[in-house]
């Protein structure tokens, strides 16, 4: 049994805390709202994020970092990209020794275009309280993980031993974990699939069917691969769990908040209206901005991302964006997979 702190008490953080508790670990789940943590400690539920689910009694809720982090042997970060730097700055002073950090967030920082592991490393550069950084990613709706339905994910780190440690920490009969040495590819695939899920949602809102969805997913994976390999990822990673696997589950399920947000946009709602209705973070919106800017900087052809960016940030009508996508210059399919 190990003492593990899970920072972020939303649906995904709570589901991962359940996996760790099922594996016999002492789990401290850290949230911002005292009433939410009181509910967890008294009734062992988190109805706002995982309705009708009973959490293991070995999960304890905390709002204070100092109390939650005392004596922990590993930290799992499950917070939005925009909160990642601040969260790392808050936890580092309370670490009594260097510990491994596992993050299960998906995004790219718009201001710097940094991946999440890069952000974490930068915030720990002066203290060296983090011994290793691992990402956990893959096709994994929190609702299904909490119901203990069979799920497979991948973990990646620059440190192979850290990846194996994370695999052992999480793996059980319902939650199968693979390792992958391609940290860049796993992070890029997990982040950029949210863009394609948004785009698939938009096409659904416009009334288009499965043909359109399949086209967006397939060509979307091609541009994810182009950007990822340019940034140093291995092409094969994008055909795995953190690439194709995550893309399928996020683009085809009503559980996906990015897909649902995209559908509302396709139906004519403004971005502000969508965010108000969702009531939760839609990572794909910020990631669309970051990926578009990266593609311009690196001169990578990403037409789906560009079209979605024009809808989200330039006010282009979704029908017009779809027409422009279909009217692009003739191309060879395979030759354009890994180059612009």
Swiss-Prot record:
<feature type="binding site">
    <location>
        <position position="138"/>
    </location>
    <ligand>
        <name>sn-glycerol 3-phosphate</name>
    </ligand>
</feature>
<dbReference type="GO" id="GO:0051287">
    <property type="term" value="F:NAD binding"/>
</dbReference>
<feature type="binding site">
    <location>
        <position position="106"/>
    </location>
    <ligand>
        <name>sn-glycerol 3-phosphate</name>
    </ligand>
</feature>
<feature type="binding site">
    <location>
        <position position="246"/>
    </location>
    <ligand>
        <name>sn-glycerol 3-phosphate</name>
    </ligand>
</feature>
<keyword id="KW-0963">Cytoplasm</keyword>
<dbReference type="GO" id="GO:0005975">
    <property type="term" value="P:carbohydrate metabolic process"/>
</dbReference>
<dbReference type="InterPro" id="IPR036291">
    <property type="entry name" value="NAD(P)-bd_dom_sf"/>
</dbReference>
<dbReference type="GO" id="GO:0006650">
    <property type="term" value="P:glycerophospholipid metabolic process"/>
</dbReference>
<dbReference type="GO" id="GO:0005829">
    <property type="term" value="C:cytosol"/>
</dbReference>
<dbReference type="InterPro" id="IPR006109">
    <property type="entry name" value="G3P_DH_NAD-dep_C"/>
</dbReference>
<dbReference type="GO" id="GO:0047952">
    <property type="term" value="F:glycerol-3-phosphate dehydrogenase [NAD(P)+] activity"/>
</dbReference>
<feature type="binding site">
    <location>
        <position position="12"/>
    </location>
    <ligand>
        <name>NADPH</name>
    </ligand>
</feature>
<comment type="similarity">
    <text>Belongs to the NAD-dependent glycerol-3-phosphate dehydrogenase family.</text>
</comment>
<feature type="binding site">
    <location>
        <position position="256"/>
    </location>
    <ligand>
        <name>sn-glycerol 3-phosphate</name>
    </ligand>
</feature>
<keyword id="KW-0520">NAD</keyword>
<comment type="pathway">
    <text>Membrane lipid metabolism; glycerophospholipid metabolism.</text>
</comment>
<keyword id="KW-0560">Oxidoreductase</keyword>
<dbReference type="GO" id="GO:0008654">
    <property type="term" value="P:phospholipid biosynthetic process"/>
</dbReference>
<dbReference type="InterPro" id="IPR006168">
    <property type="entry name" value="G3P_DH_NAD-dep"/>
</dbReference>
<keyword id="KW-0547">Nucleotide-binding</keyword>
<comment type="function">
    <text>Catalyzes the reduction of the glycolytic intermediate dihydroxyacetone phosphate (DHAP) to sn-glycerol 3-phosphate (G3P), the key precursor for phospholipid synthesis.</text>
</comment>
<feature type="binding site">
    <location>
        <position position="11"/>
    </location>
    <ligand>
        <name>NADPH</name>
    </ligand>
</feature>
<feature type="binding site">
    <location>
        <position position="281"/>
    </location>
    <ligand>
        <name>NADPH</name>
    </ligand>
</feature>
<feature type="binding site">
    <location>
        <position position="257"/>
    </location>
    <ligand>
        <name>sn-glycerol 3-phosphate</name>
    </ligand>
</feature>
<feature type="binding site">
    <location>
        <position position="258"/>
    </location>
    <ligand>
        <name>sn-glycerol 3-phosphate</name>
    </ligand>
</feature>
<dbReference type="GO" id="GO:0046167">
    <property type="term" value="P:glycerol-3-phosphate biosynthetic process"/>
</dbReference>
<feature type="binding site">
    <location>
        <position position="257"/>
    </location>
    <ligand>
        <name>NADPH</name>
    </ligand>
</feature>
<dbReference type="Pfam" id="PF01210">
    <property type="entry name" value="NAD_Gly3P_dh_N"/>
</dbReference>
<dbReference type="GO" id="GO:0046168">
    <property type="term" value="P:glycerol-3-phosphate catabolic process"/>
</dbReference>
<feature type="binding site">
    <location>
        <position position="283"/>
    </location>
    <ligand>
        <name>NADPH</name>
    </ligand>
</feature>
<feature type="active site" description="Proton acceptor">
    <location>
        <position position="193"/>
    </location>
</feature>
<feature type="binding site">
    <location>
        <position position="140"/>
    </location>
    <ligand>
        <name>sn-glycerol 3-phosphate</name>
    </ligand>
</feature>
<dbReference type="InterPro" id="IPR008927">
    <property type="entry name" value="6-PGluconate_DH-like_C_sf"/>
</dbReference>
<feature type="binding site">
    <location>
        <position position="142"/>
    </location>
    <ligand>
        <name>NADPH</name>
    </ligand>
</feature>
<protein>
    <recommendedName>
        <fullName>Glycerol-3-phosphate dehydrogenase [NAD(P)+]</fullName>
        <ecNumber>1.1.1.94</ecNumber>
    </recommendedName>
</protein>
<dbReference type="Pfam" id="PF07479">
    <property type="entry name" value="NAD_Gly3P_dh_C"/>
</dbReference>
<dbReference type="InterPro" id="IPR013328">
    <property type="entry name" value="6PGD_dom2"/>
</dbReference>
<keyword id="KW-0443">Lipid metabolism</keyword>
<keyword id="KW-0594">Phospholipid biosynthesis</keyword>
<dbReference type="InterPro" id="IPR011128">
    <property type="entry name" value="G3P_DH_NAD-dep_N"/>
</dbReference>
<feature type="binding site">
    <location>
        <position position="193"/>
    </location>
    <ligand>
        <name>sn-glycerol 3-phosphate</name>
    </ligand>
</feature>
<feature type="binding site">
    <location>
        <position position="32"/>
    </location>
    <ligand>
        <name>NADPH</name>
    </ligand>
</feature>
